Every structure is written in structure tokens, then in C-alpha cells.
Amino acid sequence: MEHAKLTKNLKLKIKNAQLTKAAGLDKLKQKLAQAGSSDTKNSPVSKAQTKEKSSKKTAGTTASAPEIESGATESTARRIRAKDRSSFAAEEPSTTVALPGDASHLTLDALPSADSTEPLSNSSQEKIVEDAVETPNSPQEDGKELQEEVANEQPARNEETPIIRTRTEPKSVVSIKPKFGPTGKHINHLLAKTFKAPAKETKAAAPAEETTQQTRPSVETASTKQQQPSGTNTRPAQSAPAYRRESTNNNNNSKRGPDRDRTKRSDENVKAFTGRDRYGLNEGSSEEDKWRKKRVHKTKKQSEEHVVQCPSHIKIALPITVKDLAAEMKLKASELIQKLFIHGMTYVVNDVLDSQTVVQYIGLEFGCTIEIDSSEKEKLCLVENTVRDEINETNPQKLVIRSPIVAFMGHVDHGKTTLIDALRQSNMAASEAGAITQHMGAFKCSTPVGEITVLDTPGHEAFSAMRARGAEVCDIVVLVVAGDEGIKEQTVEAIEHAKAANITIVVAINKCDKPNFNEETVYRQLAELNLLPEAWGGSIATINTSAKTGEGLQDLLEMLALQAEVLELKADPSARARGLVIESELHKGLGAVATVLVQNGTLHLGEALVFNDCYGKIKTMHNEHNQLLQSASPSTPVLITGLSAIPKAGDPFIVVKNEKVAKEIISARLAGQQRSAALQKKRPNFDAVLQNKKTLKLIIKADVQGSIEALAHSILNIRSEKVDVEILSSGVGDISESDIRLASASKATVIGFHTSVESHAESLIKSLNVKVCLFDIIYHAVDAIKEIMTGLLDPIAEEKNLGAAEIKATFKSSQLGTIYGCLVTEGTMVRNQKVRIIRDKEVLWKCSLSSLKRLKEDVKEVKKGMECGILLDNYQQAQIGDTLQCYEVIYHPQKL
């Protein structure tokens, strides 16, 4: 039986050996055996220890064949198990166990034949392979085997003892794990510390293989250490895990995660973080802070006061602002303002200084001489002298006699235009609105004594500017005085204009055909004005005339010719033309046209000329008879076209080289005017705001520029302490849509003088509800504007007493309230009038008398001495004995 078992076990061993050889495990055994022998030779372990350990190792094998076979299988399995482990793990002491001698000396001859043995199935082969390649034993099983080997120690056999190589590990360094709080950080890490400079890494990191091999612990060794009983010396003491040693020894060189992996620092190194550290005031206080990046503190450079010296001499052009003057003088504007304020002048930086005296005085205060630069002004001003000065400076050989310019002046309705019509044999007076002249006319008429240029001026008080302009341009003034009325206000004004211009005066006493004509009255009035007539031994020529009968007209012409001969009126026709604008207007077909009077030189067709703020190139030139002219000699009035804009009446003109030069001059002038207008903006009138003045806003449109001037002058002369007049816009031509829209936006009134409304603007007037007033006579326009100004004022309320009644009894009514039984003591109580409730001579309330009854009948009024029932509107607190005064409110319009 035993022999059969042995045979079976032997067969299994042989089969396993064949499988091992087939799998190539025999070569692995040889390599392991050679490695073990080399380690045994190099190891310093003593032979006694080797024998003792080998005896302990072989004690577990039994003498019987099955036990030897199991031991061989076990050793083989261990060698295979060592291969399965990671090659990067720490090596264990390897042991080599030799097979028993009986098994090693077996040969294939002793094996049974193939025929006698039954073939193994696949399942049996798989089972045998599983037995041969066993899984490693658990640590508990290894421990039990070691205990059994120690207990059943047997003497060593004569077999070759295996050599065991052991590895002594250094003692592990015990590291104390710091305790962390709920935040996951140590308490010392939460305190403010001074930071140290990070250590520079000089050594490169170890390869991943070495790190893994060193740090990976032996699971089997650790588990064996836990199961090994204390007091046994069978195995050397195990050291601490590799990863703990690594973290303990190389803590400074290894990179860790958050602060909790850092080593605990001593309290001596902990430094409180203060506000000085935040602002970098503790820099360099310790060596640890040397690594910190020093803040670059910008050192405050002491501002050196650069004493800028004011220049001793500058050259400026006027007007100039305070700011610009300070810049030119290299000073602060505040210094100039302070100096001006000290001398009683209040200015701000944007105010304009246009006085040469003020500018130069301020310069002297700072030690600077200021010179006024007038080069630009000289460039824009083509000529400096007047026409008369230019004629006086001209070579006498070039001068020729010219026609006299005669201006007819006088009071309104004294017959100036009628007298001119009689001289010209025309009928201009019939076409004038209101039978008064409202435009200035200039024309040349031929008389038996020669040609005379006549200027017809308006006589109304509104046209004083026209009269002044006529007095400046004319040579002789014919003062027309009505013999039946004498000298009036505008006559006196005309005399003053003539005296101011030092012009010869000839007095024409008109309307000599009337029965109440009295020339002596006119002589006396002239003498009172220091104009002594020739009849009284003076030098003033007086002529009695009648425009209707023609009496005295020839004498008047002869007198004018005599005066012109005495004056020796001459001009230079070869010079460039200079003159004055008599009137200008906007023609629908021709555009801007102007009536000009040539005073010196000759004006030719196609020449370029410059006015104050516009220029032009003459396209057409007509006389008063609408005849086309090629040239105009001195003392000739002509109507010219081709202007860039409408010139103002009274503007002088002069001929320039070409249109390009004229355009450049006007562009420079307009730029200067715009700059001056921007600098000299009117400050808001705070007095009007404080006085709560009302303002009438107007937009004026007229047929000619002179009419606008006259109307604006008349409107602005309306004096009122309660209403101010502001002219928003004025222009020549018909009233357009833009004028209506501007009036609607600004709540203004449109005034049209001798003009009309464009057809497409009439519907806009109704839709926007704009007030438009059209006039043909100037004094009608002025009167209408006064009425509009008066309508802006709130009427004055006046209370007029009507009667009084005393309350004798009171009656309560649930529907009507309190009814007062009264006795009328004075006057009349009238229904629906105002009532005062008076008690102890004090007015308690004012209300309306809503109901008045007499004997249960509604009456309109109750007279004195009668009783009545009165119901007051919204008042129920009157008592017996109170007095009810009835009154009415009368509104009176205010006066300007």
C-alpha cells in the first residue's frame, strides 16, 4: 500500500518536473541558486549562525518522501513567488533548499513506460500546474510554520546546508505627527510669520524608479513584524516604513503640499506681523527679511521754486483776455486778478481787457512795458484817412469839380418830399405809405444851374440815424421849415447834425401859399438856435418856397449853385472808388442790392469792393431811372448788385484789386468779430431777475436795412421799469418759415415792416399759434409794441366797497347750512359779489355772497335799511354782531 503511494507521488513529482522544464522554470532555479551562492560567499554572516539558521529552516521537513516532496514544492513555489513580486521592491533574505538525495538521483529509467501510464487529461494538467505554482502564503501561515520549525527542531542532515542572506536595516527615526485643528492647519501656521527665502534646489530630483524602490514598503515584512512575538531573535528588527523615513530625513529637500506638511517651527522664529511690515517700514531689520523685494519708494523731490521773471517788454493785440495776458507776461492769472482787484477792477480769467490804458498800467505794476500790436488791424483797415482827407492830400492837378450833394432835412409833414418832387418834376410823395418818407432816397437831377445830387431823409423821430448819415455825406443841408408851424423837434435835431458835421445850411421856409404863413416867427426861432438869417443881418440864407405853386424853386436852385461854387467841391476821378452805402435791401430776383454814393474816384462795372462785413463784385449798376451804367463818377448814386451779403446802411466801401483779396479781408474780419463776440458775451442781468421784470421778445423783418435800424432804435428807446424788450433776430426780406419756428420756440412776437409773409409760412402761423404784426408806418409799429408790452404786465386790482350789513340772527339748515339774518346798514348788498366778515374791526374771512333773499324771494340787491337773508359761500362760523362788507374788484392796467 505504501509502495503504491510512493509510486503515485513519484509519478506526480516526475510529471511536475517535466512541466517545470517545459515552462522554463529549471533555468530560473539555477539562476536563483547561483545568486544565493554568490550572496553567501560575500555575506559576513558567521558559519555558526548559518548552520543554526539552516537547521531551523530544514527542521520543518520530514524524513518521509511525501514530506520531502512537499518541501521541494514549497521551496520551488517560493522562488516563483519572489519573481512575481515587483522588481522595485526591497529584497528579502533569500533561502535555497536542496532537494532530497533520493529524489535528485532518480533517473528516467526508473519511470514506468509510456504504455503503462495513463495519459493525463487537460484538467489534471491544469491542476498540476496550479499545485506547482502556488500563491504566496499569508503572513499568519508563515508565522505558524516558523513556530512549528522552532518547536520541532531536528538535527541537521548530512545534506548541503542552505545559506541564508539577511539585510540589516537601520533604526527607524520616530516622527511625531503634528496635531491639526478643524481648519486642517497647525496653530503655528495660522499665526503671522515672517517668510523665509525659498531654498534653491541644487540637486535634481531622483528618478522615479529609485524613489519608488526606496519609498515602497515591504508589505510582507511589515506584516511579519506585527505577528512576530517579542523576545525571539529569529529575525532582525524591522525598521520604520520607508515613506516615514523619507519624510523625516529629507523634509527640507522634498516639496510638500499645504502648510500642514511643513515641520513645526519653534516659537523663537515666529515674528508678529505689524502695520510697519505692511508698509515695508521694517525692511532690513533682520537677516530673514533680506530676501524680500524692497519697495521702490519714490523720494519726494523737493519742488524747487523756479522764479520766472516777467519779461520787460511784450507786444500784444487788443482785445485780450486776462488769461492770455497772464500767459504773455509769464504770470499766473490769479496774480493779475489780485492786482486788478486791488485797484478796484473786478475781473475773472475769461473777462476781456479792451482798454489800452488798463493793460499798460497793469504791465507797469509788474515792471513790464506792454506795446499794443495794431499790425493786424492795419491790415484789415485798408485806409485810415477819410474821403475828405484823401481829397485834400491829392495832387490839385488831378482834381475836377463835382456835383454838390444836397440833403433835405426837416420835421415830418413839412413838405420835404413834395419840394423834391417839384424840383425833379416827379411824384414820389404819392407812393409813400402814410404820406411820410420812411426810406432814404438818393438821386441825381438836372437843373438849369447844373446837376445836383439830392438826398431825401425821413422826418420821423425814429430815423435820426438816417438823418445823421445824410448830414455826414452831404455838402449842403436844406432845412425845410413849414411857415405855418415853425421849427419843431426834428428840425432842431437836423440843425444839430448839420452843426456837428460843419455843413452849410440853407433854410427853405415852405408852404408860403398858406394864409397863416409867418416868416418872422421862423426868423425868431432860427435866431434862438444861433442861426441868424440874412434878413436880420446874418449869414444864413432863407428862401420862401411853395411846392404846390412852384414859388421860390428857381431861387433855391440858384442859391444851391452859389453855395457849391463857394465851397469849391472837387474830387479825383482817377483814384480808386470810395463811397458810402445809402440803403440796402434783399431783392427777390437780384438778391442783395445796395444804393451807394460815390464820393471819390470812379466806380466801374466788374470791380471788386469791400464793405465792413461783406464784399462783392459788381454785376450790374443802374441809376435812379433804372438805366444800366458802365461807370459812376463822383457824387453819383447808383444801385449795384453782386454782393455776398446785405451791407448795413452807412457802411463805407472801397475798391480792391480783385475778388480773392476782398474775400480774404472779409474772412479775417469776420473771424475777429466772432472772437470778440465770444469773448464779450453779455453777462446775465441779475437785476432784472431780482426785480422780476417781464421781457418782450421780438423778431423784426423789414424791406431795407435802414428800416430795421430805425425800427430797432425806436423800440429800444421805449423806457420801462417793468418790461424789457429783447430783439432776438432782425433781417431784410419777407417773413419765412424759419422766423415762425424761431418765434414759436422762443415765444416771441414777429414784427414786419414794409414786408409780407411767405405763402408757405401762413399755415405754419396758425398751427404754431404765433403772433405776427405787419406795419407800413413806423409810429404805428411803435405804438403796437407799447400795447404788447403793457399787456404783459399784471393788472392792478382795486377793491370798491358797495355796502355793509350787520348779522342780527342765525338759522341752521340741514341742506343749506347757516343762514344769516342781516340788516343793511350802509350802501347796497349785491348778490355774487365779494364779502368781508369783520369782527372787532378785524377781517376774519373773505368769500362770495352766494344767495340773497328778501321776504322769501331771491333778489339781486338789497338797499340800506332793509332786512335780508344772506347765505355765504363755504363759511359757517359767522356770529351775531359780525359785519358783512360787500365789495367788488376792479382791475386797472399798469402803465409802462
Curated annotation (Swiss-Prot):
Mention one GO molecular function: GTP binding
**Which Pfam families has this protein been placed in?**
EF-G_D2, GTP_EFTU, GTP_EFTU_D2, IF-2, IF2_N
* Composition bias type Basic and acidic residues, residue spans: 156-170, 256-280
- What name does UniProt use for this protein? Translation initiation factor IF-2
Note the InterPro entries from the entry: EF-G-like_DII, EFTu-like_2, IF2_II, IF2_N, P-loop_NTPase, Small_GTP-bd, T_Tr_GTP-bd_dom, TF_IF2_bacterial-like
Q: Where is the composition biased (Polar residues)?
A: 35-48, 114-126, 213-237
Q: Per the annotation, which location comes first and is thus the protein's main one?
A: cytoplasm
Q: Where is this region: G1?
A: 410-417
Give positions of region: Disordered.
Answer: 32-306
Note the superkingdom of the native organism. Answer: Bacteria
Q: GO CC annotations?
A: cytosol
UniProt xrefs under SUPFAM superfamilies: Initiation factor IF2/eIF5b, domain 3, P-loop containing nucleoside triphosphate hydrolases, Translation proteins
Annotated tr-type G domain residues: 401-570
| Function of the protein | One of the essential components for the initiation of protein synthesis. Protects formylmethionyl-tRNA from spontaneous hydrolysis and promotes its binding to the 30S ribosomal subunits. Also involved in the hydrolysis of GTP during the formation of the 70S ribosomal complex.
Renumbered residue ranges of the record's region G3:
456-459
**Family listed:** Belongs to the TRAFAC class translation factor GTPase superfamily. Classic translation factor GTPase family. IF-2 subfamily.
State where GTP binds. 410-417, 456-460, 510-513
Provide the protein's localization: Cytoplasm
Ranges where the record places region G2: 435-439
HAMAP family found in the cross-reference section: IF_2_B
